Amino acid sequence: MKIRKSAEDYLEAMLVLQEEHGCIRSIDIAKKLGVTKPSVSYAVKRLRESGYINMEANGPITLAPAGYKIAKRIYERHKALTAFLEKLGVSREQAEEDACKIEHDISHETYVAICDSLNEGREEKLGSYDFE
């Protein structure tokens, strides 16, 4: 099933918040993405109905396995693309912004080539090839 870019953004933000704070709250999602709380409520409802997240009434939000897989793929791409753009001389802020746009549409072949280029001569590898 093809997932929308906005849903990928929400899932990625949730993963980052979970890693940074240990929990996912709607208010934090709104702040991270620069959207309104009603927008978050609508997105959370749709993501829950699609099986990407779990949430009890007034309870914490957690990523379901399907949502985690998508979030991890997008976040890995984001990190690798940011590093690649910085390697090209792009400022960190601009690299982050551009990576956020590219991460959704880049082909697997191009992503692998970027990771291979970044990882040449490195011990700690960037990117993951487990995702298509």
Question: Across the structure, where does each feature detected by a protein language model lie?
Answer:
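C-terminal regulatory/oligomerization modules of transcriptional regulators
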Residues: 97-132
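Alpha-helical residues within the helix-turn-helix
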Residues: 31, 48-49
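N-terminal helix-turn-helix DNA-binding core of bacterial DNA-binding proteins
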Residues: 2-35
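Basic, amphipathic "hinge/linker" alpha-helix immediately C-terminal to the N-terminal HTH DNA-binding motif
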Residues: 59-77
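Key DNA-contact positions within bacterial/archaeal DNA-binding proteins
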Residues: 38, 93
